[in-house]
């Protein structure tokens, strides 16, 4: 008798097996692992999740946070600061065109916060309920065509919250090739939730079709990048091994604690750099440096991309935070639908922010971080410019 047979004999001797009727969640959990009805349920889950994030986010933005910022907070801070600080650079940095307490509150609280909060509400629920691992199993064949295993889907989805934890989460990959590919895919084509919130706000004045096209473009770039990298990077991708927990309702206390922790990290890791970038924008505007930089970048910004000259601030601030490549576009009057889509495309594909560059350097090396940053920047300008030029050619 070999070791395995001996182990089975001992287990059978000491284990008591009782037949019980599976609960509804047990039956649903098992069904979600099969192509039918698993794939329709998975697609419905994704659609409902996006509906909650975008629909409820727009409601919070329009009826609660928008009035709170525009009618209460901004007038309050303007009154206080105007009374305390006299006209000058400091006054303009605080409540001017790019003021911390004017445009800063609008971008952070009204344009981005509702979508970030709802993303983490939905993602944490999918994570704690056991739905995410089942999605990984169902989409394993699709993920393998991208050169990674299905289990990597969870890590990539995490990138829609923030690229930093997604890159750190790539440590779970079983090969170096897969880990590098996951990190590159997140940097090239996955918008963080702050950037997604800014894009939703940008396209709200035009058509929801633009947002759909943007995500289709993101997916297309993701497939192309993964296909190219799978041929360039040497190595293999191991078969998927993933633990499938029971399908259950999340524990309320643990769920709330996780949600609070993620929002705390968002405010510390995202909003502080965003405030810094707003200060930089205000200083560039007040000192006249913005106009000087715009002169040198005008052939790219206005000529190739077809964007207004003032959009140069988006390219500068996007280096600090990805959503800041979108936020300045919200303030440009007379922006056309094509310009909004081109600007959104460049922002979507633009180089990783400073925090992502830092984590890439730490997890891999500085050479890899520089290579990804240069490649994403060139890709963003190339794709954005091609869309603009082709649109003018056929329109």
Listing of model-derived features with the role each one plays in the protein:
Residues 1-11, 137-148, 223-236:
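Short, non-transmembrane cytosolic segments of multipass membrane proteins
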Residues 1-29:
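Switch/coupling subdomain of P-loop NTPase systems
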Residues 29-45, 264-274, 364-372:
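Alpha-helical transmembrane segments and their helix-start/interface "positive-inside/aromatic belt" motifs
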Residues 40-48, 117, 121, 216, ...:
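Generic alpha-helical transmembrane segments of integral inner-membrane proteins
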Residues 41-109, 119-125, 129, 135, ...:
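Transmembrane helical segments that form the transport core of multi-pass membrane transport proteins
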Residues 106-108, 122-181, 185-193, 199-209, ...:
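Membrane-interfacial helix-loop connectors
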Residues 165, 170-178, 188-190, 197-246, ...:
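Juxtamembrane and boundary regions of transmembrane helices in multi-pass small-molecule transporters
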């Amino acid at each position: 008798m070999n070791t395995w047979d001996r182990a089975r004999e001992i287990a059978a001797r000491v284990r008591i097996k009782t037949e019980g009727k599976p609960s509804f969640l047990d039956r649903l959990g098992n069904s979600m692992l099969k192509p039918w009805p698993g794939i329709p349920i998975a697609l419905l889950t994704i659609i409902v999740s996006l509906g909650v994030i975008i629909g409820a986010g727009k409601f919070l933005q329009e009826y609660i946070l928008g009035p709170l910022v525009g009618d209460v907070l901004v007038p309050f801070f303007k009154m206080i600061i105007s009374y305390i600080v006299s006209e000058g650079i400091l006054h303009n940095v605080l409540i001017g065109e790019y003021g911390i307490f004017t445009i800063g509150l609008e971008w952070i609280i009204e344009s981005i916060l509702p979508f970030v909060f709802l993303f983490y509400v939905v993602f944490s629920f999918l994570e704690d309920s056991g739905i995410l691992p089942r999605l990984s199993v169902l989409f394993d064949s699709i993920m393998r065509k991208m050169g990674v295993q299905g289990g990597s889907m969870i890590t990539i989805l995490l990138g829609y919250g923030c690229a930093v934890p997604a890159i750190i989460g790539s440590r779970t990959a079983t090969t170096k090739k897969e880990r590098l590919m996951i990190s590159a895919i997140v940097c090239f084509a996955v918008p963080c939730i702050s950037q997604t919130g800014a894009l939703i706000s940008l396209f709200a004045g035009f058509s929801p079709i633009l947002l759909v096209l943007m995500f289709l473009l993101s997916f297309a770039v993701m497939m192309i990048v993964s296909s190219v990298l799978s041929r360039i990077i040497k190595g293999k991708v191991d078969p998927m091994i993933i633990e499938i927990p029971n399908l259950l309702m999340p524990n309320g206390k643990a769920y709330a604690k996780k949600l609070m922790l993620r929002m705390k990290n968002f405010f510390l890791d995202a909003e502080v750099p965003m405030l810094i970038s707003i200060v930089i924008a205000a200083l560039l505007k007040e000192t006249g440096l913005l106009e000087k930089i715009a002169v040198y970048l005008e052939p790219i910004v206005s000529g190739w991309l077809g964007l207004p000259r003032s959009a140069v601030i988006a390219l500068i601030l996007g280096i600090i935070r990805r959503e800041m490549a979108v936020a300045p576009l919200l303030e440009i009057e007379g922006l056309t639908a094509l310009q909004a889509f081109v600007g959104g495309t460049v922002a979507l594909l633009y180089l990783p922010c400073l925090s992502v560059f830092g984590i890439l350097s730490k997890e891999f090396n500085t050479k890899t971080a520089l290579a990804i940053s240069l490649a994403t920047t060139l890709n963003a300008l190339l794709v954005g410019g091609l869309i603009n030029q082709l649109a003018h050619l056929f329109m």
